[in-house]
UniProtKB/Swiss-Prot annotation:
Coiled coil: none annotated. It comes from Cuscuta reflexa. The gene is rps18. It holds the Pfam family Ribosomal_S18. Belongs to the bacterial ribosomal protein bS18 family. Residues 82-109 are annotated as: Disordered. The lineage of its organism: Eukaryota, Viridiplantae, Streptophyta, Embryophyta, Tracheophyta. GO terms for biological process: translation. This is Small ribosomal subunit protein bS18c. InterPro entries: Ribosomal_bS18, Ribosomal_bS18_CS, Ribosomal_bS18_sf. GO terms for molecular function: small ribosomal subunit rRNA binding; structural constituent of ribosome.
Length: 109
């Protein structure tokens, strides 16, 4: 057969299916922190169902469980460490100059 008349045959590449993120034995519950924390980003945001290949029902259950765990303070709302205070710093009054015009405009009775 001539090379130009030969039908195009696509090579079959083998691919590996991804394992589901939630196994059938896993229970989606707000108390199961080890399972829930896998579906949060580094900032503490809930990852989309497209990222973890959830079904719509699984995504709703995970979202509700994360929100319940946050309300019950089992999980933090954010995972940022910038808000933690390491040491107390003395406050200075030199941060903002006082506006003298405001004081002069007040009427005395």
């Amino acid at each position: 057969m001539d090379k130009s008349k030969r039908p195009f045959i696509k090579s079959k590449r083998s691919f590996r299916r991804r394992l589901p993120p939630i196994k059938s034995g896993d229970r989606i519950d707000y108390r199961n922190i080890s399972l829930i924390s896998r579906f949060l980003s580094e900032q503490g945001k809930i990852l989309s169902k497209r990222v973890h290949r959830f079904t719509l029902k699984q995504q709703r259950l995970i979202t509700l469980a994360i929100k319940q765990a946050r309300i019950l303070s089992l999980l933090p709302f954010t995972k940022r460490k910038g808000f933690e205070r390491s040491e107390s710093t003395p406050r200075t009054n030199a941060l903002k100059p006082r506006n003298k015009n405001k004081q002069n405009n007040q009427t005395q009775f």
